[in-house]
């Protein structure tokens, strides 16, 4: 066996079908598009959701809700994630980004009570803290300051 004699396994590679290259190819002339009509033309076809003139499903459904352009989106940090920090550390948006716990501060940081906080005296200075998270941090001997 030599490098120049290597071949792909039979049936592992399929030859690309080139359309419009003569009638004997099986896909010449109309290139597999059939005869006349919208779908045979270049750029032909209907837009997504079009149902032949019948009112489309998405138009039959009622509108719901709205998107508040002034919404505040917080970077979420759970108690179990705070266990990565050393004892006595100050938890702020800057320290969390530096520790690569969060990527982006967004409108601020919110601490939630998912998971357990092992006994650590943390000083938490963030935008928002849930009531359960605040209780857990203070029970572990830490302090919470909401900015």
Swiss-Prot record:
One of its GO terms (cellular component) is cytosolic large ribosomal subunit. GO terms for molecular function: rRNA binding; structural constituent of ribosome. Residues 1-13 have a biased composition (Basic and acidic residues). InterPro entries: Ribosomal_uL15 (IPR030878), Ribosomal_uL15/eL18 (IPR021131), Ribosomal_uL15/eL18_sf (IPR036227), Ribosomal_uL15_bac-type (IPR005749), Ribosomal_uL15_CS (IPR001196). Residues 1-57 are annotated as: Disordered. Keywords: Ribonucleoprotein, Ribosomal protein, RNA-binding, rRNA-binding. The keyword Glycoprotein does not apply. Residues 23-35, 42-52 have a biased composition (Gly residues). GO terms for biological process: translation. Binds to the 23S rRNA. Belongs to the universal ribosomal protein uL15 family. Part of the 50S ribosomal subunit. NCBIfam families: rplO_bact. This is Large ribosomal subunit protein uL15. It comes from Lactococcus lactis subsp. lactis (strain IL1403). The lineage of its organism: Bacteria, Bacillati, Bacillota, Bacilli, Lactobacillales.
């Amino acid at each position: 066996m030599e490098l120049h004699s290597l071949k792909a396994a039979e049936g592992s590679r399929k030859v690309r079908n080139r359309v419009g290259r003569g009638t004997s190819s099986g896909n010449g002339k109309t290139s597999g598009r059939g005869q006349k009509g919208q779908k045979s033309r270049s750029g032909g076809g209907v837009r997504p959701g079009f149902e032949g003139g019948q009112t489309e499903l998405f138009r039959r459904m009622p509108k719901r809700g709205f998107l508040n352009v002034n919404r505040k989106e917080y970077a979420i940090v759970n108690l179990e994630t705070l266990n990565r920090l050393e004892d006595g550390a100050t938890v702020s948006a800057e320290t969390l980004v530096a520790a690569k716990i969060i990527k982006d501060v967004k409108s601020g940081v919110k601490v939630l009570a998912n998971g357990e906080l092992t006994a650590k005296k943390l000083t938490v200075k963030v935008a928002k803290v849930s009531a359960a998270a605040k209780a857990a941090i203070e029970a572990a001997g830490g302090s919470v300051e909401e900015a």
